[in-house]
Swiss-Prot record:
Protein name: Sex-determining region Y protein
GO molecular function: calmodulin binding; DNA-binding transcription activator activity, RNA polymerase II-specific; RNA polymerase II cis-regulatory region sequence-specific DNA binding
Subcellular location: Nucleus speckle; Cytoplasm; Nucleus
A Gene Ontology term for the protein's cellular component: cytoplasm
């Protein structure tokens, strides 16, 4: 039960899913076993033992680097000055401004980042950054969702893939028909020499 609580904390950040509540709620215990048996696949097994520790570690945020330390206040300031500017555009502007700073101007933020990294190492001595691939994140999200939601999400992805393949097949077929329609007509009438050759072959 404790291992399941560790797994569910990665999805639901609420006290309702604490181990004590699970032990006192029979319905929740039944739903937990249902989700674990129906949603988890062989590629992403249910997290127990060592796997639960990895799940806890994945939730730990990386320490901020110098750019993130500098851009926190700059991003907030730019968003207030340009309320209609999209976040992606703000990020581009911040990246450009950071490159334009001198090493002396960047140095205080590097020092602050080093302090934060030292505090992070002290708090999480066994932390190792593990980047996730987007495709694996999608499959893992299916395994962590309730069975009904996971099946609907995964079915939608499969349906979109089938529709894409069908559209490609239809486009190829219509393109072939268009090319065949522009070919010169085949003359089925045979010449007199061909007819004589055919009649001679028949007599033989």
């Amino acid at each position: 039960m404790q291992s399941y609580a560790s797994a569910m904390l990665s999805v639901f950040n609420s006290d309702y899913y604490s181990p004590a509540v699970q032990q006192n709620t029979p319905a929740l215990r039944r739903s937990s076993s249902f989700i674990c048996t129906e949603s988890c696949n062989s590629k992403y097994p249910c997290e127990t033992g060592e796997n639960s520790k990895v799940s806890v570690q994945d939730r730990v945020k990386r320490p901020m680097n110098a750019f993130i330390v500098w851009s926190r206040d700059q991003r907030r300031k730019m968003a207030l000055e340009n309320p209609k500017m999209r976040n992606s555009e703000i990020s581009k502007q911040l990246g450009y401004r950071w490159k334009m700073l001198t090493e002396a101007e960047k140095w205080p933020f590097f020092q602050e980042a080093q302090k934060l990294q030292a505090m992070h190492r002290e708090k999480y001595p066994n932390y190792k950054y593990r980047p996730r691939r987007k495709a694996k994140m999608l499959q893992k999200s299916c395994s962590l969702l309730p069975a009904d939601s996971a099946s609907v999400l995964c079915s939608k992805v499969q349906l979109d893939n089938r529709l894409y393949r069908d559209d490609c097949t239809k486009a190829t077929h219509s393109r072939m028909e268009h090319q065949l329609g522009h070919l010169p007509p085949i003359n089925t009438a045979s010449s007199p020499q061909q007819q004589d050759h055919y009649s001679h072959s028949t007599k033989l």
